[in-house]
Structures are given as structure tokens and as C-alpha cells.
From Swiss-Prot:
Lineage of origin: Archaea, Methanobacteriati, Methanobacteriota, Methanomada group, Methanococci
Protein name: Uncharacterized protein MJ1369
Domain of life: Archaea
Length: 155
């Protein structure tokens, strides 16, 4: 049997509502290239990282400005593009603004922050809220989830 090598990701949001919608739909979305200047500037870096996200990787969901971590999820798959509006701003505009999707097989979510921790990520992609977590950072976050929710084990 082959070992599965997981990567730990940080997905940042500007609000908890987007994380809650992700939890309810089991889908996260990233901006399209034409969303703004940061997205245009960092598009190539984003696509390189997005293409590294794979099934069984783990994502940690954080509010960017506060460092509050509210969810953790196991990635099921990535999509090339999805035009189904699910976030509030997409529904209001009747237009998809986060078409680059990642689906999840499981997400653990808390309206209260599980841990508050600003994480320095070397390759963080500004404008997309995406970066790769170091193993020791992930372990600290996982311990906080274990304390709040009981036994959670990811090796």
C-alpha cells in the first residue's frame, strides 16, 4: 500500500460567513484573475499553487485580518472552473466571483475561533488568500481542534 503524502494549506477569508458557506456547501472558491490588481499580479503564482492542491490534503480556514481559525477540512478534489453562485456576493450579483473551486470530503467548523494565530507563510499568495502551512504550524492548529472537539487524528 502506498503512503499518502498530505500538504497542509492555509485558506484565508475576509469574513466568517464565507467559511460558513464553505462548510455548508463543502466547497471553497478562489477569485478569478480579473477580480482586481492583486489577482492579476499574482495570477501565475496562484495557478502554480492551485495545481498543487490534491485529494487528501488538509486546508485550514483563517480570517485574514484577525488570525482566527474557524475550520479545518480534508480536500476531496479541485475543479477547473465552476459557474454556480454560492457565496452571498455571487448570489447578489448573479455572477460567479470565486470560480476556482476546491471540494471537501469533511470539514470541521466552529463559529467561535478555535485558535487565534497569525501564521507567517513564505509563499503566501496575496489576493488569493492561499499558502502552504509548515508541518509544525499545522500540528499546533490540530491540537487546538483536538482540544475543542475531542479526538481528531491526522497522521
Amino acid at each position: 500500500m502506498r503512503d499518502i503524502v498530505m500538504t497542509y494549506w492555509l485558506f484565508s477569508s475576509n469574513n466568517i460567513r464565507n467559511i460558513e458557506i464553505c462548510y455548508n456547501h463543502m466547497i471553497w472558491g478562489f477569485w478569478d484573475r480579473n477580480a482586481g490588481e492583486k489577482q492579476k499580479k499574482n495570477w501565475r503564482s496562484f495557478i502554480r499553487k492551485y495545481n498543487q492542491i490534491k485529494p487528501f490534503d488538509v486546508a485550514v480556514f483563517q480570517i485574514a485580518k484577525t488570525g482566527e481559525i474557524h475550520a479545518i477540512g480534508v480536500i476531496k478534489e479541485t475543479y477547473y472552473d465552476d459557474q454556480t453562485p454560492i457565496w452571498d456576493n455571487e448570489i447578489n450579483l448573479n455572477k460567479v466571483t470565486f470560480p476556482w473551486r476546491v471540494s471537501f470530503s469533511v470539514i470541521i467548523f466552529s463559529k467561535e475561533a478555535v485558535i487565534k494565530r497569525f501564521i507567517k507563510i513564505q509563499d503566501y499568495i496575496d489576493g488569493y488568500g492561499l499558502g502552504e502551512l509548515e508541518h509544525h504550524d499545522f500540528n499546533e492548529i490540530l491540537k487546538a481542534f483536538q482540544k475543542k472537539f475531542g479526538m481528531i487524528s491526522i497522521k
